[in-house]
Amino acid sequence: MATETVLATAVSNGKSKGCCKSGPGYATPLAAMAGPREKLIYVTALYSGTGRDKPDYLATVDVDPSSPTFSSVIHRLKMPYIGDELHHTGWNSCSSCHGDASADRRYLVLPGLISGRIYAIDTKTDPKAPSLYKVVEPKEIAEKTGLAFPHTSHCLASGDMLVSCLGDKEGNAKGNGFLLLDSDFNVKSRWDKPGHGPLFGYDFWYQPRFKTMISTSWGAPKAFSKGFNLQHVADGLYGSHLHIYQWPEGEMKQIIDLGNTGLLPLEIRFLHDPSKDTGYVGSALSSNMIRFFKNSDDTWSHEVVISVKPLKVENWILPEMPGLITDFLISLDDRFFYFVNWLHGDIRQYNIEDPKNPVLTGQIWVGGLLQKGSPYKAVGEDGNTYQFDVPQIKGKSLRAGPQMIQLSLDGKRLYATNSLFSAWDRQFYPEIMEKGSHIIQIDVDTDKGGLTLNPDFFVDFGDEPDGPALAHEMRYPGGDCTSDIWI
């Protein structure tokens, strides 16, 4: 169903050449850390799956403490259709193009995970009020590549964009792979070579210095789109593998089976320093942080570096509750990583200066199924039950659990939303279907470590004009530690 949205007029890509002009982003991760403080955040907000017959939208949130509209939504760009399930976002150009003076970080790449559309959003003309530039239709994508369910996008130094797609149009995982778009969002081809598609799709990260791209595994869209069923894991409808590709050729070199220690490996990040051949992946269901690294023979291996133990619980659907690590990120100086436990409700900070041995330096509970007042209780080793204290902000209780996170360039502010995916939200946290999502800010101690909830920042998507909405991924206009790749 269409709603009215005016498409922005195509604008020049600013293709001026010159020795004094550089491309988008920053020359190095440490240069990015010294960049300006964030003033705006773009957030995917959706009504898909909520029962409200409204289009999803891109919310612009004011995060400038000196602004009179601080901690509020100042603009909403509604999509022209209903039912997209906006999810993750990326850029048409980022720090991987820093050496190209003609490149311009102008368009936010906004896939609809369920509809299969990909929107190009102009954020340059008016950063506070983005506009719709172009729509890539799912029919064209399917006809030219056989791909559907677009998820993660990354810009390439060539000017093209690469988008992971999680299945074919019928929702089968076997049809998943990688979509290549040109600089004006025209469908070029599949990136992966014929016969080299991954077992399952989700996230990916590339590192040109090691001629490698690694992708992760969620599950078959026909399974996860209906909610989570543990039997589907046993039935082979969810993944536990990392796929190692030759970059940029698109040939699969190796598949790493993480086994039961790596069920549902979702987000993946290399260290930001492009000379480092290591990084991490967060395994959601197993609730492990897994380090991957390159061997001397050019193969790749892995090891579990953090295990979040499941908690014994009462009154829940299972006798034990996993943490469910659904997102993590790495600070730009590669000193810390942060991850969330969506079900337990905590966010953790670890020092990773020794990548093999992360050290817990901060932890805070900001929601979860086990907060005080919940019908669910954790059971200690002594048999006594307990629940976690979760603070209120501005008189409002924190709902659901921390889900997507975004870190300021200087590493001192961590933002968190609480919606994972509408079908899973409804299953695990039905409250946010009626009360909506929120964004919180956590102040970070980058000297000694530590996390503190900021009492002055709270964006309540329960108060949106068209009704409570679900908020997911966040992006800054100038790039961030999960969008930009240095080469």
Swiss-Prot record:
Q: What cellular component terms from Gene Ontology apply here?
A: cytosol
Sorted alphabetically, the keyword list is: Acetylation, Selenium
* Description of the deletion phenotype: Impaired fusion of polar nuclei.
On this chain, the residues bearing N-acetylalanine are A2
One of the GO biological process terms: polar nucleus fusion
Q: In which tissues is it expressed?
A: Mostly expressed in seedlings, leaves and stems, and, to a lower extent, in flowers and roots.
Which signals induce this protein? Answer: Slightly induced in roots by cadmium.
Superkingdom, natural source: Eukaryota
| Keyword Transmembrane set for record | no
- GO molecular function of the protein, one example? selenium binding
Is Acetylation included in the keywords of this UniProt record?
Answer: yes
SUPFAM superfamilies, A to Z: 3-carboxy-cis,cis-mucoante lactonizing enzyme
Name of the protein in question: Selenium-binding protein 2
